[in-house]
Structures are given as C-alpha cells and as structure tokens.
C-alpha cells in the first residue's frame, strides 16, 4: 500500500458524522455546552471531512459571499476537542466554511473558526461557564465570565460576520443561532483525524489537530 494521499471532494458532497450518543462525562458535558452559531453573512458551516478522510474542496471567492454555500443538504457539523489545561477544563468547538469572502475580490478558499468554552471541571450537574474565547482573526476575544445576554441556558451564542473589507470572525452575540451535530476528535475515524492533521487548507488553519490544539489553548487562555 502506498503513502496516504489527500482527496478533495466537492464541498456539497461531504457527509457529516452523526452525533454519537455521549457515553463519558466529558462527552456529555461537551454536548450540553454546544454553542449556538448565528451566520450574519457569508457561508454557512459545512462538514470538512468524512469518515473516509476525504476533505472538503471548498469554494473559489467568486459570486456572492454566500454563493453556493447557504447550507449542505447532508447537514452541518461542529467539531470538538477537550483537555485539562492550567487547572481548568477547555472545550474547543470548531466550524468549517467553504470560503471566507467579505465581498467580491476579497477573501480566500476555506475558513476555520472556533470558540473555546472554559469550565472548572467536566461535571454533568451544576456546570458553570467561566469564560469564552472566540477566534478573532489571528487571535482571540475574551469574556470572563460571559455576558448573561450572550447565553441561552448553557449555550453560548456567537455570530459569524465580517466587517468589510476584513475577513470573517466570531464574536459573542445576543442573537440566537443554530446548533450542529457535534463530533469530538476521539470519536472520528482514524482516516478523518489523519486528514485533519495532514491536509493543507491554504490561508486557513485547522485549530484542533494534534499539532496545533494545545498551542491554541495557550494563546487563548483567559485567566
């Protein structure tokens, strides 16, 4: 058998992982704290990789900012990864978008955005969000603790938007949004994890793979 090779497929052909029944406390807490995402402009989130490790080919920055990417017929996906970090528990939630296009002639193929939800420890009862750190271009914005108006119960609310001519980013919002099926890093197939570790995404960077994840927690640490 030859070396593993990346395989890109049409952005609308990537099927998401169904959300598994959570078994461990960590998995149950990750599902409980799934954030809401409100898309103000641009693409809606799409699956980035399938069970075989085939990856989303994305879209050129042509047409309208939301052209050809208003939602996958197969359903969307939010990815997750968690870890203990500096005495607290971090859960990263990650979305993939086929293009990041604030307007014609601006932007790039592929976009990854994410938010890190910080809690004291993974417990099913009386879990409390200590902070949220959404990705904001090359860094993070931080709310310690989150504004109550930016929460819907245990779901932190975020908006995906662009302030022209700058590319899209996340910020907390009062607006309600949608949740997607969650698949955690350890729940994915080995082919999918390998693809997310190896495949290049141009100007966008996968924030939760083995080579990047802990560094992102370090950069976003809000305390």
From Swiss-Prot:
Induction: Expressed strongly at the early stages of host infection (up to 24 hours after infection) but subsided quickly afterward. PANTHER family: DOMAIN PROTEIN, PUTATIVE (AFU_ORTHOLOGUE AFUA_5G00600)-RELATED (PTHR33657:SF8). A motif (Conserved undecapeptide motif) lies at residues 90-100. GO terms for cellular component: extracellular region; host cell cytoplasm. The structure of NLP effectors is remarkably conserved with a high level of conservation of a central region containing the conserved undecapeptide motif AIMYAWYFPKD and heptapeptide motif GHRHDWE. Probable secreted effector that may act as a pathogen-associated molecular pattern (PAMP) recognized by the plant immune system. Seems not to induce necrosis, neither in several susceptible or resistant Vitis species nor in the dicot model plant Nicotiana benthamiana. Belongs to the Necrosis inducing protein (NPP1) family. InterPro entries: NPP1. This is NLP effector protein 3. A motif (Conserved heptapeptide motif) lies at residues 107-113. Keywords: Host cytoplasm, Secreted, Virulence. It is found in: Secreted; Host cytoplasm.
């Amino acid at each position: 058998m030859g070396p593993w090779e990346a395989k890109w497929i049409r952005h609308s052909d990537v099927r998401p992982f169904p959300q598994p029944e959570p078994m461990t406390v960590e998995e149950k807490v990750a599902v409980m704290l799934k954030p809401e995402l409100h898309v103000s402009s641009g693409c809606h989130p799409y699956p980035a990789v399938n069970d075989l490790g085939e990856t989303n080919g994305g879209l050129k920055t042509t047409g309208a900012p939301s052209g050809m990417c208003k939602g996958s017929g197969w359903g969307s996906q939010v990815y997750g990864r968690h870890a203990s970090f500096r005495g607290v528990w971090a859960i990263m939630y990650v979305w993939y978008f086929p293009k990041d296009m604030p307007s014609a002639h601006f932007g790039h193929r592929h976009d990854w955005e994410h938010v890190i939800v910080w809690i004291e420890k993974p417990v099913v009862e009386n879990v409390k969000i200590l902070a949220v750190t959404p990705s904001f271009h090359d860094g993070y914005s931080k709310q310690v603790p989150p504004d109550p108006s930016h929460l819907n119960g245990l779901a932190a609310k975020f908006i995906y938007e662009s302030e022209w001519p700058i590319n899209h980013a996340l910020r907390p919002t009062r607006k309600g949004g949608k949740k997607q099926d969650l698949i955690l890093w350890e729940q994915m197939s080995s082919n999918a994890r390998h693809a997310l570790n190896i495949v290049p995404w141009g100007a966008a960077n996968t924030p939760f793979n083995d080579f990047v994840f802990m560094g992102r927690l370090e950069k976003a640490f809000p305390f």
